[in-house]
């Protein structure tokens, strides 16, 4: 039942975010600048799905995402710094699903558990 609810939430967020979709950026593509943490699991003309594993203590290099739906699969603590912004520490909880606007940032796992995320980028 929980998997069905997560799937329904993802589909609903995709529909809501669809009209605000943007092209996937190329110059700071996480698959190119952070291939050790970002893996492509699916891509078609509508979406690109990335699986992200960030081990404790790892800081990802500056990278960019287009509009996307993010699904957190594990609990972990992050320090996220948007380009030109101040660091923000956040506890990410397993099961959280959110829609995200385009961003250029770097992410540091400041906790003791691996961060596991699915990112559905809208094209």
Language-model segments: what does each one mean?
Residues 1-4, 19:
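Positively charged n-region of N-terminal signal peptides that target proteins for export
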Residues 7-17:
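Hydrophobic membrane-insertion alpha-helices, especially the h-region
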Residues 21-29:
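Ser/Thr/Pro/Gly-rich low-complexity linker/stalk segments immediately outside membranes or between
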Residues 34-61, 66-70, 120:
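A short glycine-rich, His/Asp/Glu-containing loop-to-beta-strand
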Residues 57-60, 96-108:
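Histidine-centered metal-chelating micro-motifs
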Residues 65-84:
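Glycine- and acidic-residue-biased ligand/ion/polar-headgroup-sensing regions
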Residues 75, 102-123:
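Ligand-binding loop in jelly-roll beta-barrel domains
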Residues 84-102:
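Short acidic-glycine-tyrosine-enriched beta hairpin
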């Amino acid at each position: 039942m929980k998997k069905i609810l997560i799937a329904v939430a993802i589909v609903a967020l995709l529909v809501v975010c669809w009209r605000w979709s943007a092209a996937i950026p190329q110059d700071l593509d996480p698959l190119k600048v952070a291939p050790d943490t970002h893996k492509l699991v699916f891509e078609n003309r509508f979406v690109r799905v990335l699986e992200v594993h960030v081990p404790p203590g790892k800081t990802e290099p500056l990278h960019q995402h287009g509009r996307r739906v993010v699904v957190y699969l594990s609990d972990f603590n992050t320090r996220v710094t948007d380009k030109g912004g101040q660091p923000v520490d956040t506890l990410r909880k397993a099961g959280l699903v959110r829609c995200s606007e385009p961003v250029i940032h770097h992410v540091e796992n400041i906790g003791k558990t691996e961060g596991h995320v699915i990112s559905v980028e809208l094209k």
